[in-house]
A protein has these predicted regions:
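Glycine-rich adenosyl-nucleotide cofactor-binding module
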Residues: 47-60, 95, 99, 112
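Terminal amphipathic alpha-helical/low-complexity segments used for targeting or macromolecular assembly
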Residues: 1-56, 192, 198, 207-221
Length: 221
């Protein structure tokens, strides 16, 4: 599944986690190590640029964090990022440069690349969102199957048994997810793809495409 590889989904120059991600082939392989990597990386961040607040939390001095936001352990918030009113960052999150975490949005065990946005009523868990990826209002990522079984990544007749119980979605660079959509566990969306509002998405969606529904995925012209 070449289209699911990290190198084909993301421009690694657009994240502080570049060296970490380069060690892996597929994005779901990194999920178990995000928290430990944040602790390691945080200790090396320049003190003249970052404030350490709480347990293993580093916030760039140029970031804007609203007083009502909650930030749990093991987090790095990058330059110019905006953490808005009542956002809930549970733990293990890297928020990239100029990224936005919005009102009533919840994050957990997630990497947001630079300039990515989850600005309005979103849930993002066990996921990676690429450069300039954007989730519309009320769109959520489901990271656990209803029967609690291990997640399989499926693309037509191809499949990869991950051996992992919780995987959200992997959004490539410049992905746009329409309002009110649900990305089911293990969804992979290729670069520059648009998802129509109110969609229920699963499996691997090709890059440079428009997802209208499960039976209508067209290439961008």
């Amino acid at each position: 599944m070449e289209e699911c590889k990290i190198i084909n989904l993301y421009n690694l120059e657009e994240t502080i986690a570049k060296e970490f991600l380069e060690k892996y082939t597929y994005p779901w392989e990194v999920l178990d190590g995000i928290g430990a990597y944040i602790v390691e990386l945080g200790k090396s961040l320049p003190k003249e640029e970052y404030n350490q607040i709480g347990e293993n939390v580093w916030i760039h001095k140029s970031a804007k964090v609203y007083n009502s936001a909650y930030i749990g352990e093991n987090c790095i918030i990058g330059e110019g990022a905006e953490i808005r009113h009542c956002s809930f960052i549970r733990k293990n999150a890297i928020i990239g440069k100029n990224a936005v975490v919005g009102n009533s949005t919840e994050l957990k065990n997630t990497i947001l690349f630079n300039n990515s946005q989850v600005p309005h009523y979103n849930y993002v868990g066990d996921s990676i969102l690429g450069y300039k990826a954007h989730m519309g209002a009320g769109s959520i990522i489901s990271n656990l199957k209803s029967d609690k079984t291990l997640i399989t990544i499926k693309n037509g007749k191809e499949k990869i048994e991950t051996g992992i119980r919780k995987i959200g979605a992997m959004l490539g660079d410049n992905v746009e997810v329409g309002c009110g959509s649900v990305l089911n566990p293990g969804t992979i969306i290729g670069k520059n793809t648009n998802i129509y509002p109110l969609s229920s998405v699963r499996g691997v969606i090709p890059k440079n495409s428009i997802y209208k529904n499960k039976n209508e995925i067209v290439n961008k012209k």
